[in-house]
Amino acid sequence: MSWIFSSNILLPKATDVKVTEIVVKKRKRRMYLFSGNEIIKSYKIDLGFAPEGHKKFEGDGKTPEGSYKIDRKNRNSKYHLSIGISYPNSKDQYFAKLKGKLPGGDIFIHGTDKPFRWFQKDWTAGCIAVSNNEIREIFNLVRIGTPIFIEP
């Protein structure tokens, strides 16, 4: 694997592999990168501190479920690097509004704020966490616009 420097962070150099979608299986605590019908990478993940069920409101500690897209990348994340997920979508916003609440937002795939990953209980506010080495790889492989499907 080749490497490139970016904002003082060493990133793996992109390969010819095109990630066509991301699938998250919350119960299994796994995230899969697909190229067509082939799984090209699999990662152990941590989720929101209250992971059961779909995220409905700001502060509920749940990781969303449903179909979203990767909508941004952040090289200056508190959690090493981060990749934005397009939560909330219009359905999420509508449901929260009906209940008189905010749906929350700023849901990301990210690394940790530690030099290495502590395998611990789910700890994020609703995000999907991987190790810092893994987020460097994911950050370089995944493009803005990539679909992400988050399953229970």
Give short role names for the model-derived ranges.
Residues 23, 32, 69, 84, ...:
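Short, conserved beta-strand segments within well-ordered enzyme catalytic domains
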Residues 21, 42-44, 67, 106, ...:
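Well-ordered beta-strand positions in beta-sheet-rich domains
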Residues 5-53, 152:
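Intrinsically disordered, low-complexity
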Residues 32-33, 39-42, 61-62, 100-102, ...:
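Mature, folded catalytic cores of secreted/periplasmic enzymes
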Residues 72-152:
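Exported/periplasmic cell-wall-interacting domains
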Residues 9-20, 47-71, 93-95, 112, ...:
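N-terminal post-signal-peptidase region of extra-cytosolic proteins
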Residues 1-3:
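Hydrophobic membrane-insertion alpha-helices, especially the h-region
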Residues 18, 39, 64, 77-79, ...:
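A short, polar/charged loop/turn motif at coil->beta-strand junctions and beta-hairpin connectors
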